């Protein structure tokens, strides 16, 4: 498994970086309401593929039009806004540890008239004081990637990557689905990081495969897991 020890720390893993980025994006949005900020992995169309995956699998496990959905590391909330435009009309919640992210996403929700359907909360998902409740679907689009670059230790000992699956298990209902997209980890690495006795790989999303130096691979991967108990 590629753990955090194998990844260099980066400013992308710091709260300061994201606070400054989303503060700037909020300022830009206030000047121009059409500018809602960047969409991660847009070059791979990952967000739309994740949404299409959920729509295509309605009826499987806890995936339904009324499913409760939480987006970990929601950023500007773009994925939830897009998801709300589909069949999904259940409780949609975005979580981020950046206060500026929550301000930006909340402002966009209010300006677009969906603040009664989508809510955003600032939280440290690794804190024992966090009381998130449980959801039918948990989403992650690049959040584990950013977290893995932070160099953070839980209780000064455990890498955040090593406890991430426990966070997901904590907030996911039985038969719930965790859908994650990553550019830092391969599909096999994600399975090793996320799979537990209760969380098992279910399906994957296909992306274009490239060949370089005789080796085939994709620049991004998305894996869905189901919580069995």
UniProtKB/Swiss-Prot annotation:
Q: Which reaction does it catalyse?
A: L-lysyl-[protein] + S-adenosyl-L-methionine = N(6)-methyl-L-lysyl-[protein] + S-adenosyl-L-homocysteine + H(+); N(6)-methyl-L-lysyl-[protein] + S-adenosyl-L-methionine = N(6),N(6)-dimethyl-L-lysyl-[protein] + S-adenosyl-L-homocysteine + H(+)
| Enzyme Commission number | 2.1.1.-
What Gene3D superfamilies has UniProt attached to this entry?
A: Vaccinia Virus protein VP39 (3.40.50.150)
Q: Print the keywords alphabetically.
A: Cytoplasm, Methyltransferase, S-adenosyl-L-methionine, Transferase, Transport
Keyword match Transferase: yes
Its localization reads: Cytoplasm
Coiled-coil regions, chain positions? none
Offer a single GO CC term for the protein. Answer: cytoplasm
One Pfam family hit? Methyltransf_31
**Gene Ontology biological process terms from the UniProt entry:** methylation; vesicle-mediated transport
Q: What class of enzyme is it?
A: transferase
Which GO MF terms are attached to this record? protein-lysine N-methyltransferase activity
- What does the record say mutating residue 212 to A does? Complete loss of elongation factor 1-alpha 'Lys-316' methylation
The entry's other comment says:
Present with 1620 molecules/cell in log phase SD medium.
The similarity comment for this entry is:
Belongs to the class I-like SAM-binding methyltransferase superfamily. EFM4 family.
Q: What does this protein do?
A: S-adenosyl-L-methionine-dependent protein-lysine N-methyltransferase that mono- and dimethylates elongation factor 1-alpha (TEF1 and TEF2) at 'Lys-316'. May play a role in intracellular transport.
Q: What is this protein identified as?
A: Protein-lysine N-methyltransferase EFM4
Q: What is the originating organism of this protein?
A: Saccharomyces cerevisiae (strain ATCC 204508 / S288c)
Gene designation per UniProt? EFM4
